[in-house]
């Protein structure tokens, strides 16, 4: 007697049947049992490693932590990048940076008030190719702990760079370990004297990044560079409830 589908049990009841006093099982159920046993073996091998790993703590991505993100766009600029070279993105002490930043692209008012504490600071870089249908990747190099008196070169040669993310966006954490940012009147300093805002307010407590950007193209490319500072702030709860009306 051959295999007859009518003699087989329903899929909802099981995957085995008895034909001519022989216990038969589908090949799919056999493969499923093998896979299940392999998963049990892998779990048994992983359990001792997991017990040891649970004794240690690791830090999560601080960008995804608690707090509110406040983004300030410093400038947007189109620059031409030569092949096999990298261009300095931002010269923090240059007059061109101050003029371009504060006269054209900067926000009129600083969005962080005095009752908010800065928890973290990020340097955000967004790159966009200006010509369509260009097949190349963006490369990047940066330094954080540079000497304040160091004069950065505008153009350097590419040497072991790394690729910018798939969305052509990169964030660099500028926090210094062991230094807490004090509560200061940031809004008034920013609006009254923006030229000293970086040197006197930010850089004593955060790293001043030197960021270089390049491409993998063999031709001269025009790139739109958008530079922004992203503040992660912690808002304090008000001292009195914000209720209005005759009952209060």
Curated annotation (Swiss-Prot):
- Residue pairs linked by disulfide bridges in the UniProt entry: none
Which GO cellular component term is one of those annotated? viral occlusion body
User: What domain of life is recorded for the organism?
Assistant: Viruses
Which GO molecular-function terms appear in the entry?
A: structural molecule activity
Keyword annotations of the record: Viral occlusion body
Which family is annotated? Belongs to the polyhedrin family.
Q: What does this protein do?
A: Component of the virus occlusion bodies, which are large proteinaceous structures, that protect the virus from the outside environment for extended periods until they are ingested by insect larvae.
- Could you identify this protein by its name? Granulin
């Amino acid at each position: 007697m051959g295999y007859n589908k009518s003699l087989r049990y329903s899929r909802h009841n099981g995957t085995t049947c008895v034909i001519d006093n022989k216990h038969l099982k589908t090949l799919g159920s056999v493969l499923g049992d093998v896979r299940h046993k392999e998963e049990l073996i892998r779990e048994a091998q992983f359990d001792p490693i997991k017990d040891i790993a649970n004794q240690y703590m690791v830090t999560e991505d601080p960008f995804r932590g608690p707090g509110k993100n406040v983004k300030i766009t410093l400038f947007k600029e189109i620059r031409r990048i030569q092949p096999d070279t990298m261009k300095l993105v931002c010269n923090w002490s240059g007059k061109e940076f101050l003029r371009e930043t504060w006269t054209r692209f900067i926000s009129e008012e600083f969005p962080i008030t005095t009752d908010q504490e800065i928890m973290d600071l990020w340097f955000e870089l967004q790159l966009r190719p200006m010509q369509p249908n260009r097949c190349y990747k963006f490369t990047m190099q940066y330094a954080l702990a540079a000497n304040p008196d160091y004069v950065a070169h505008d153009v350097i040669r590419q040497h072991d760079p790394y690729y910018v993310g798939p969305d052509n966006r990169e964030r660099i954490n500028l926090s210094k370990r062991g230094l807490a940012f004090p509560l200061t009147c940031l809004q008034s300093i920013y609006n009254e004297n923006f030229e000293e805002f970086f040197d006197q307010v930010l850089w004593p407590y955060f790293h001043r990044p030197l960021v270089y950007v390049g491409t993998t193209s063999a031709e001269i490319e025009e790139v739109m560079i958008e530079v922004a500072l992203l503040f992660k702030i912690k808002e304090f709860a008000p001292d009195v409830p914000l209720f209005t009306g005759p009952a209060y």
